[in-house]
């Protein structure tokens, strides 16, 4: 939805620019990352069927008319069990605190469940403008949607309610227009052609982590992380990328490698294809799997992921 251009010359009343930060808050798998990618028009946040995919704040940027909207995709709000969980939830609330507008994303298909109710309760004292976004509405009957919207608005005084499908884009244009009209007047925060503030090295690692999530099941992906250790631009215009998949135990390493290395090879092929499409360059991707016990308690790993280490 980057369909605007920066106004030329001095600002007038008709062309005055707007800009602001919009945080997306919701339970895991509510569709926050899918919505960010839909509004931005390309992938800036990874999406899988697994919950708790987003770990750190990811900012996606789109332009709507004279407005530049910075979307802050936060980790899902849930009851933390591990140190990493605590860091993710703390980061999510931190992202909301600094935003001009908060989008509260609820999976309409999941209904008004315990997670949704707890999330709404926590939003009562939030002072920023709050917008309710019911996602996945294409899978729910209209009477159920209306009932869900009514219950949510009885708990929290939302400024607006939108019903969308982040996956197919239904309702997203209206949401984008509303955000563009609602962010404050002011200069743009980022250059016109920038769609994210995530470094390419980190995005490449996130893409590989996404393919790891999609390929493997159970708890293994949550005991793993991916880091880009080398990025070399080559004379022929291609790029050589070396990444390390860290796991906590030798048994997990065997699962990631697979029989004769077939699993990690498939992960690498899928990641290489997508990274190449984003860069519009030939990519030579090399994956290594290493055991690092208790990486989830290593402050350095948290810094790599853009998280504060919880004490």
UniProtKB/Swiss-Prot annotation:
InterPro entries: G_ERA_dom (IPR030388), GTP-bd (IPR006073), GTPase_Era-like (IPR005662), KH_dom-like_a/b (IPR015946), KH_dom_type_2 (IPR004044), KH_sf_prok-type (IPR009019), P-loop_NTPase (IPR027417), Small_GTP-bd (IPR005225). Residues 73-76 are annotated as: G3. Residues 216-293 form the KH type-2 domain. Residues 18-185 form the Era-type G domain. It comes from the Bacteria. Residues 135-138 are annotated as: G4. GO terms for molecular function: GTP binding; GTPase activity; ribosomal small subunit binding; small ribosomal subunit rRNA binding. It is a peripheral membrane protein. Belongs to the TRAFAC class TrmE-Era-EngA-EngB-Septin-like GTPase superfamily. Era GTPase family. This is GTPase Era. The gene is era.
């Amino acid at each position: 939805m980057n369909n605007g251009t920066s106004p030329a010359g001095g600002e007038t009343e008709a062309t005055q620019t707007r800009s602001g930060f919009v945080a997306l808050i919701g339970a895991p798998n509510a569709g926050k990352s899918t919505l960010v990618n839909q509004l931005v028009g390309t992938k800036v946040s990874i999406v899988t069927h697994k919950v708790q995919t987003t770990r750190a704040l990811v900012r996606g940027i789109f332009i709507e008319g004279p407005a530049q909207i910075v979307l802050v995709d936060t980790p899902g709000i849930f009851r933390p069990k591990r140190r990493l969980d605590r860091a993710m939830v703390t980061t999510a609330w931190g992202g909301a605190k600094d935003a001009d507008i908060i989008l509260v994303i609820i999976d309409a298909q999941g209904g008004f469940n315990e997670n949704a109710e707890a999330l709404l309760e926590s939003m009562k004292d939030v002072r920023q403008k709050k917008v309710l976004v019911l996602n996945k509405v294409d899978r729910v009957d209209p009477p159920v949607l209306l009932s869900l919207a009514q219950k949510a608005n009885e708990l929290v005084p939302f400024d607006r309610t939108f019903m969308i499908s982040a996956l197919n884009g239904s309702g997203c244009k209206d949401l984008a227009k509303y955000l563009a009209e609602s962010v404050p007047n002011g200069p743009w925060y980022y250059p016109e052609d920038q769609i994210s503030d995530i470094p390419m090295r980190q995005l490449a690692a996130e893409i590989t982590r996404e393919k790891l999530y999609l390929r493997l099941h159970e708890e293994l992906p949550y005991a793993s992380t991916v880091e880009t250790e080398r990025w070399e631009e080559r004379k022929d215009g291609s790029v050589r990328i070396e990444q390390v998949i860290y796991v906590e135990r030798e048994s997990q390493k065997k699962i990631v490698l697979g029989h004769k290395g077939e699993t990690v090879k498939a992960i690498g092929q899928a990641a290489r294809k997508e990274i190449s499409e984003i860069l519009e360059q030939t990519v030579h991707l090399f994956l290594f799997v290493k055991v690092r016990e208790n990486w989830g308690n290593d402050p350095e790993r948290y810094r790599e992921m853009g998280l504060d280490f919880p004490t």
